[in-house]
Swiss-Prot record:
Family to which the UniProt record says this protein belongs: Belongs to the cytochrome P450 family.
UniProt-listed CDD domains: CYP142-like
Entry EC number(s): 1.14.14.84
Enzyme class of the recorded protein, top EC level: oxidoreductase
InterPro entries per UniProt: Cyt_P450, Cyt_P450_B, Cyt_P450_CS, Cyt_P450_sf
Protein name as annotated: Linalool 8-monooxygenase
Its biological purpose: Catalyzes the 8-methyl hydroxylation of linalool.
Catalytic reaction list: linalool + 2 reduced [NADPH--hemoprotein reductase] + 2 O2 = (6E)-8-oxolinalool + 2 oxidized [NADPH--hemoprotein reductase] + 3 H2O + 2 H(+)
Gene3D superfamilies the UniProt entry points to: Cytochrome P450
Annotated pathway: Terpene metabolism; linalool degradation
Residues the entry annotates as binding heme: C355
Length: 406
């Protein structure tokens, strides 16, 4: 059997290698993937094994000091030593109980009551963005819809000027694009981006300390963890996580779903005729898109996964994109089916590290496609989208499409 290198970002530049994932799920579902430095990691590919690892955060650590929450490539984190020192560890790379303390800090801003309060404003923004998109002609929906909507939502949640959304867009692309030369042109370019972002963060941190408001930036700036106030570097790390997590997942789920609906127009016909299905179809959108390809853990004791022995210290990588197409869980798993119910996807992770903004992301998906269903008869893809060069995010740089009016 050919031994694919799942870490290689070039493997994802044309499409997610679902054929490789399917073969490995059948033949070697806990797969040893060597790395160029002589080490390697266990690739966990089945849905049930991903769930099992995710529910044991102390046995399978996400902590930065144990290796963190993802795998890196030739550029590693892509920051200077000074940059690393200035950016603290985000709570996604912390284990309980500290991880749990951070979740408790941020969750009031993402409670069902709070989300219900902001849904109408999200709808107004989505309607305004869609209203400006010309129908019947080729447009790129990434800068017109997929990117600005979640970033405008984040601007509200963080208490920022909505006009800063494009600046946030460029910063987050640089932070997650360490393997993509379009996003990370040079160390000098990254240093400039980091300097701009650090200045923005310091000003925001000081502002929210001096004048607290009802926003996530205030919650993060004034948090106390283990009885101690957070430092600026911790605020920066968690603000970065909030911007990336709250933007890239929603943005790419919108884009991938439109691509899929252009390929399966019967599913769009169903949603147009039965828009009430969008309350559950958003889970299918995330499952099929898998905006986050993987997360990493480190085994803290000798153990086993799916019958495979795992040694203490071994790297374990959970391939969400594979788990979301697991045929033993999802019938006709490669097919996008808006009538599918009870979708237990792992697109936002699972267990104690499940994405804190998952409800917000699915709400934005529902609102966008509710509005589009009243205006668009079908989506016609004009060209293949350029993809992120990344083993971490399933990202589209552009989405050239015609929105055919009703």
């Amino acid at each position: 059997m050919e031994r694919p290198d799942l870490k290689n970002p070039d493997l994802y530049t044309q499409q997610v290698p679902h054929d490789i994932f399917a073969r490995l799920r059948r033949e070697e579902p806990v797969y040893w993937n060597p790395e160029s430095d002589g080490s390697g990691f266990w690739a966990v590919l089945r849905h049930k094994d991903i769930i099992e690892v995710s529910r044991q955060p102390l046995l399978f650590s996400s902590a930065y000091e144990n290796g963190g929450h993802r795998i890196f490539n030739e550029n590693e984190v892509g920051l200077t030593n000074a940059g690393e020192a200035a950016v603290g560890v985000p709570f996604i790379s912390l284990d309980p109980p500290v991880h749990t303390q951070y979740r408790k800090v941020i969750m009031p801003a993402l409670s069902p009551a709070r989300l219900g309060d902001i849904e109408q404003r999200i709808r107004v923004r989505a309607e305004a963005l869609i209203e400006r998109i010309p129908l019947g002609e080729e447009v790129d929906l990434v800068p017109l819809l997929s990117a600005p909507l979640p970033l405008l939502t984040l601007a509200e949640l963080l208490g920022l000027d909505p006009d800063c959304w494009y600046e946030l867009y460029n910063w987050t692309n640089a932070f997650v694009g360490e393997d993509d030369p379009e996003f990370r042109k040079s160390p000098e370019d990254m240093a400039k981006v980091l300097g701009e972002f650090m200045g923005f963060c310091q000003e925001l941190f000081e502002s929210r300390r001096a004048n607290p408001g009802p926003d996530i930036a205030t919650l993060l700036a004034n948090a106390e963890i283990n009885g101690q106030p957070v430092a600026l570097r911790d605020f920066i790390g968690n603000l970065t996580l909030t911007l990336v997590g709250g933007n890239e997942t929603t943005r790419n789920s919108i884009s991938h779903t439109i691509v899929t609906l252009s390929q399966q127009p019967d599913q769009w016909d169903i949603l147009r005729q039965r828009p009430e299905l969008l309350k559950t179809a958003t889970a299918e959108m995330v499952r099929h898109a898998s905006p986050v390809l993987h997360m990493r853990r480190t085994a803290m004791e000798d153990t086993e996964i799916g019958g495979q022995a795992i040694a203490k210290g071994d790297k374990v990588v959970l391939w969400y994109a594979s788990g979301n197409r697991d045929e033993s869980v999802f019938s006709d798993a490669d097919r996008f089916d808006v009538t599918r119910t009870g979708v237990q996807h792992v697109g936002f992770g699972s267990g104690q590290h499940v994405c804190v903004g998952s409800r917000l992301a699915e709400m934005q998906l529902r609102v966008v496609f509710e509005i589009l269903s009243t205006r668009v008869k079908r989506f016609e893809l004009c060209s293949k989208s350029r993809r992120f060069r990344s083993n971490f995010l399933n990202g589209l740089k552009n989405l050239n499409v015609v929105l055919v009016p009703k």
